[in-house]
């Protein structure tokens, strides 16, 4: 993996040069000081500043990535790196690996929280292992995931509550991403090498995607995404819903489909948000890959033609590689389903 010159903070999404990274003292005896950068990120009320250990830059090391720095206050060495803009602690893979901010977008009650909760568990327990790697949670990520989505979905066997809007309640944790480091082994010239990827997942309320002003405030991460998963609720398509019995529809949806924002409206706002951020013209093509994904697929399985690839188990993990033939088959089948929705 080539040496990075810049990185994107997985918390505030500002882009910085690697040489601008800061460190935070970890010596408990070092005096706490007001941290205005972290305060602005957390709640914006500078009259009640968050307190923390001092932050500072490492001496210039040329092209090399600084590994540590000495605190100018207490003279102790620290390895804790933080973002220069928001002072949140950063995973080492942010500097050394590839940034992979994954945005999951969709209207209210499409199942975004469930999708993130399940895909994270699949990556941890199955996918990373089958591909000869491992996925580790950063800081308190694993604790928050296990106590939240994992506990309710896998232990209590219950559905998750609808995510609260970050605008209505800034303390609900929705703005704090789940950050993981995915490590994958590959063959090098003389020995095996390990590539690391910083995976960043968000659980965003559907109503936070309903207008452009809100999106530009609480969904800035979309513009920095390495990929966008566009979640589609089949219950919100009349042609699909009319083929299902009323009980199936009511069990799968807690929001009246007539009140849900149209999927094409959300995608149009996402596109405009990215174009404005990048100052792109309307005729320019956005280079962020988008995957259209049907949620609640079990509810519509009876409507899928027998023998379809999407009804079969994915072969990727069993083979320990990405199966291009399977991908092409699934892609064409989902495109076909979308064309009749």
Which residue stretches match the model-derived regions?
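Hydrophobic anchor at the beta1->P-loop junction of P-loop NTPases
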Residues: 102-104
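Walker A (P-loop) phosphate-binding loop of P-loop NTPases
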Residues: 109
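Conserved C-terminal guanine-recognition region of P-loop GTPase G domains, centered on the G4
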Residues: 193-196, 216-341
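Long, basic/Gly/Ser/Thr-rich N-terminal segments
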Residues: 1-97
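Switch II of P-loop NTPase G domains
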Residues: 60, 64, 175-228, 235-244
